Amino acid sequence: MKYLIVQDWRSTHGNHAGMKHMCDMLVEKYPSEYKMFVKEFPREWKPVKTLWEKIQWKLVGAREKKHYLEKTYPQEYLQLCKPMFAKLQDSDEIFLLEYMLPWASQYELACYIRENYPKVKIYALSHLTGKYFDEMTAKDPNLIQKWAKPVDKLLTLGSSLSSYFEKAGIPKEKISTGFHYVDSDCYQKQQPMKSNSPLKVIMMGALQRDYGMLAEVVKQCPDVHWIICRGRKNVDDLFPKTPNVELKGFLAEEELRHQMDIADVSLNVMEDTVGSNVITTSMAMGLAMIVSDVGSIRDYCDSENAIFCKNDVQQFVKAIKQLQGNFDLVQRMKASSLDKSKRLQIENVNRWFLKLK
């Protein structure tokens, strides 16, 4: 049996692109092979603003948070997994799918399993960025080696993080690289595959997205119709208040999918490829891709469906102008995205997991 231990997050709760939904799909499609244990949302800590709040934080809050993260939260994971422990056999495999997050730690769970069930295989997925680990290892240089020790393999969703782990001293054979999945039953085109005039460009996501640079690109491309899906990020003041610019706050998944369906191009001005679900869902919805050439983006895209840019305003402007009026090129790129998205289906995640043992 393969046991999937996953964290539910408010930001992806109930949608068709998060880790929990991936687990739902695996359990539904392969019920005799997978079981899932879902950790509820972690406790959130409000920003400290007033003087009184700062005093309270120093007196009580800081210690309370430390105790929650180091004691309470790991204990909650152990309680969650009690039914699994009662049935665990040496041939079973455990997948920890939110690994290396100190504020939602699965490390203590990994150590407990390794100590009490030494023959059970443990695979731990991390979908963070090299920049994140740079910041964390500046505080704790042994962090990656420490967290890697109790698990059999570290899993990643892109070659850039795999390379980072290898350079950090993790043996190559202890790392396995896969892809972010896409739910192709949910993310599929409803509108005819055609190019719009003016060109419709959509931008989505908040993680590792450079809104300042995007705003400058928008200003230099006034003859493009822009759909800026900023989520809960308050960046409205950066963009021109003109009819060709639609600024959209948090959207229900169905509405976001519709906006992708009516667009031509997915523009991704990124500092890294964290949040790869934006890339994979864009491809499944048949969008031509303009992307920052960072992280693991070339694991997902190539020159047939994407234009790669350095993080430079003029490169993005040039890419957009290359597609404007070139309907044949846009159509070819859209078709290529659709075709490439087929290798990101849930069946391929299952094949990846099967090959690990």
Please state what every model-predicted region is:
Residues 13, 327-357:
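A charged, aromatic-enriched C-terminal amphipathic alpha-helix characteristic of glycosyltransferases
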Residues 134, 166, 179-198:
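Acidic anion/phosphate-binding donor-loop and adjacent secondary structure
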Residues 151-174:
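A short, active-site helix/loop in glycosyltransferases that binds the activated sugar's phosphate group
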Residues 193-209, 215-219, 227:
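Conserved donor-binding/catalytic core segment of Leloir-type glycosyltransferases
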Residues 230, 235-257:
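Nucleotide-activated donor-binding/catalytic signature segment of Leloir-type glycosyltransferases, i.e.
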Residues 238, 294-308:
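Short acidic/histidine- and often glycine-rich active-site loop of Leloir-type glycosyltransferases
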Residues 261-274, 287:
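Acidic donor-binding loop of glycosyltransferase active sites
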Residues 303-314, 322-327:
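Conserved acidic donor-binding segment of nucleotide-sugar-dependent glycosyltransferases
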